[in-house]
Amino acid sequence: MADERSKLEQAGEGTNFSSDEIDRLRKRFMKLDTDASGILETNEFLSLPGVAANPLASRLMDVFDENHSGDVDFQEFINGLSTFSTKGNKKEKLRFAFKVYDIDRDGYISNGELFIVLKMMVGNNLKDAQLQQIVDKTIMEADKDGDGKISFEEFEAQVGGTNVYQSMTLDLF
């Protein structure tokens, strides 16, 4: 039991969760892991409440999947959820939001990446040409150093003054 507790404490290092919260998340993870493989495949991850209906569900899965394995292990699960906890700070939440847009994980949001993610959100409600105009205007406004892409610092300057990060808080317990 003590060994199990220390494993949970170790898993929780660097997160915003107490060991009791980690234990509750482990139990939730095990319920989601319907095939008891120790990892969440895409279909299991999408069974998280509110995720399947989210137009960015595939991007959320990719951001949680820190090692690019195509699935989410328990450590990745709690690391990702930590951002959404009530104890997650503004910068963590903005960093997560940035990663949703940074598809190739190069530390920048390109014109193409912004288009893809916005297309996921608006679907066919806008013509591609209209969406491209929005993307171009957004890049122009946010890109302060003129390199044609948005760095995290530029992203933070653009959206940090909004309350978007507040919508990234979930009551997990």
UniProtKB/Swiss-Prot annotation:
PROSITE patterns: EF_HAND_1 (PS00018), EF_HAND_2 (PS50222). Ca(2+) 2 binds at residues 65, 67, 69, 71, 76. This is Calcineurin subunit B. InterPro entries: EF-hand-dom_pair, EF_Hand_1_Ca_BS, EF_hand_dom. Residues 20-55, 59-87, 89-124, 130-165 form the EF-hand domain. Ca(2+) 1 binds at residues 33, 35, 37, 44. Keywords: Calcium, Metal-binding, Repeat. SUPFAM superfamilies: EF-hand. Belongs to the calcineurin regulatory subunit family. Ca(2+) 3 binds at residues 102, 104, 106, 108, 113. It holds the Pfam family EF-hand_5. Regulatory subunit of calcineurin, a calcium-dependent, calmodulin stimulated protein phosphatase. Confers calcium sensitivity. Composed of a catalytic subunit (A) and a regulatory subunit (B). One of its GO terms (cellular component) is calcineurin complex. It comes from Yarrowia lipolytica (strain CLIB 122 / E 150) (Yeast). GO terms for biological process: calcineurin-mediated signaling. The keyword Repeat applies. Coiled coil: none annotated.
